[in-house]
Amino acid sequence: SDLNIWERFMNTRHITSLVAAGAAIVMLLSGCGSTGSFSNASSTSGSNIISVYGSEPAHPLFPGAVTEAGGGKVVDQLFAGLVTYDAKGGIHNEVADSITSSDNATHYVIKIKKGWKFTDGTPVTAHSFVDAWNYTANSANKQGSASFFSTIQGYDDLQKSDVDPSATLSGLKVVDDYTIDVKLSQPDSAFPVKSGSHAYMPLPESAFKDPKKFGENPVGNGPYKFVSWSHNRSIKMVKNPDYKGNRVAKNDGLDFMIYTSPDSAYADLRGGNLDFTHAIPSTALKTFQSDKSIKAYNQPGGNTLTFTIPEWLEHFGQDEEGNLRRQAISMSIDRKTIAEKIFNNTSTPAVDFIAAPISAYSKNLKGNEVLKYNPKKAKELWAKANAISPWSGEFGIAYNADGTAKNWVEAICNYIKNTLDIDAKSIPMSTSDEFLSNVDSGKMTSAYRSGWGPDYPSADNYLVQLYDSSSADGKGGNSGNYKNPEFDAMMDKALSAPSTEEADKYYQQGEEILLQDLPAIPLWNQNATAASTSAVSGVAFDYGGGPVFTALTKKQ
């Protein structure tokens, strides 16, 4: 999901796709608005509550609505899906007993384990999943993760403007309380992999009786039980004693302390008023690893950091002028120097649109020279664009000021200004909530920071969910509404491919189209960085480099 949208991290182990299309597969379970300080005392029960950095969720805590990390990290702790992912990106059944594929990966039968229940005591059944998927996929319900279901039969009908909010996916059938039959409109070998993302989490009946109330007080089946959400201050949860899955918490609960500035969170950590943060401010990147007052963590990662120039901006349409200008701007930026000076080498310049942990990642894509610093070429391309339509106005990049983007956005704007001799400036928005509301509603009047951290370990998550037409118009992560039928066709071929190697070839051909159009401009892949107090132990990162909150403990 998006970073801050975007502040998730990934390790650099290569991850291969789970499924070869056409094979029958059974997966068996393998065994606070305030910028001041908070008190470390917790109001929740239990002796080992961990206080962690958080940002105010931009959406209700409805799994299908959440598209950013502020809410995503919370939802991931409160819910459990069909499968989970281990530290290497391996897939393990959680609520699923088996997922069987047939008919060239267009038909799946899912068996659900018995005995799971939500924290309100009601059972988790096949209906819990199917009802949740139908609700999320239906455009009338305005769920940001609708596109995750785009390959299920009947999805297109649910995207019509006059669709009934209760209409369902024709490809979903509840066979019995513990069996789901799924028919797809096209082969989708990534379906079992993405079924562990929070878009696919089950929901109890209470979620549909009063969705607004549920979004404020979610009832889940995950390793933690929701306690409270004090807006712009904290989200509290305690260990769920009835949880039956692979992620049993080693602590008694989590307090997500909501900050509007990672600098404030880091100061609280150093002062002993916060236990753990995964958001190291840019001002501390040069010093945090040598700071004796804390424990520092830094490992190779790969969340993608980009910025998007939406095609509705003047001079930036999906045409020759727009492509020339996006390429010129990209080649104006010295990614390597910014990585050294601002990120202190905790990031590496991007070479494609995905990240090193994913098997389709490549340093050798045709056209990737647009991601290299070349001011002379940038000026030539800008001049060609001016010959089509003379430039006027200013160029801005918006960002959320409560994240870690300020320094690098300002650096990029300086490069663009100095290279192209235009007025370029950064545009801060005070909170993630304000920023994301403008992004989600398509109201941005400038370029804006963007990026991605994985919901599931597949190139599909980076490419289809961000750039496919099915993910545009508020149905997924394609916030710039980029649409290119040629790219869409490559994604369809990748999902239909009989092997990971074959799929990767199509994903890479799709990326070469993106390098021409640049719907977003790739900048860096960042390391997984974090810090804790000396009392905290058990710090670990998942396949995507995100913190494993269930593993955290602290000395009393």
Can you name each region flagged by the protein language model?
Residues 173, 339, 423-435, 464-533, ...:
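Extracytoplasmic/peripheral linker and loop segments enriched in polar/acidic and small residues
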Residues 53-103, 219:
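N-terminal lobe/hinge region of extracytoplasmic solute-binding protein
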Residues 530-556:
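Long beta-strand-rich cores associated with HINT superfamily self-processing modules
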Residues 111, 128, 135-137, 141-204:
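Surface-exposed binding/hinge segments that line
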Residues 348-385, 402-407:
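Structural transition elements
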Residues 184-249, 253:
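Gly/Pro-rich hinge or "lid" segments in bacterial periplasmic/extracellular proteins
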Residues 209-215, 234, 242-287, 302:
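Ligand-site clamp/hinge motif
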Residues 125-134, 177-184, 222-223, 251-253, ...:
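Alpha-helical secondary-structure segments
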